[in-house]
Amino acid sequence: MKTEPGQELEMLQKENSILTASLHRRSFLQYAGAGAAGIALIAAGCKKDHGNDMPPVNGGVTLDFKDDFGVLNYAYALEQLEAAFYIQVASNPPSGFSAIEKQYFQDIQYHEIAHREFFKNALGAAAIGSLAVDFSTINFTDRSSVLNAAKAFEDLGVAAYNGAGVRIKTDAYLVLAGKIVSVEARHAAYIRDLISPGSFSGPDVVDATTGLDQALTPDKVLAAAGKYIKTKVNVINL
């Protein structure tokens, strides 16, 4: 049985406080307060190893975009992917990472865990299960490989939220999605700065005419993410 809409909105509003904090380019990671302890307040139920405690998906999943549950589960699927990636990086960072880079990636890990748990709790019984991921194409011992993978995930995440916004029917969900994507955009800018200091962004993600970040439809996002998601994800009613 799905969570009642009123209960969902109340839960979203209560748990979203961490996403509304003011962020600065170099100190944005501080918005998590006391790090893991601060995140734990909204990531209640997250295991000590930061894993997703939802049962694994058997076969595949179908995301039905006829209502907001489909859009929220779409975001939840992508946050599962990002959280899994950063958990692996933070648990065993490349030897080429500096001490501050290790700390930043650990903090980003907590952000993504918070996002994942946020959507899981908002969806309640309507949430999809845990997706199986495959990071075999990423060399987690190599700094460049990890940074380029992180760049791909963050850029894709921003484009995904931008493209899904028009499909959200509930105003409160749209506002909260906007707050989450602003955090993802800060992640993306930071990763790009690590790869090429001072770059911040680029014409591959920001339209030179409009000055807006790229927006991608769910089918295009999932096609790109499919490289890392073993579970078959289908979409209907786009």
Language-model features: locations:
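N-terminal secretory signal peptides and thylakoid transit peptides that target proteins
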Residues: E15-A36, A43
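All-alpha RGS (Regulator of G-protein Signaling) helical domain and cognate RGS-like helical scaffolds
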Residues: K2-E8, E15-I18, G33-A34, D49-L238
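Hydrophobic membrane-targeting alpha-helices
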Residues: A40-G45, D49
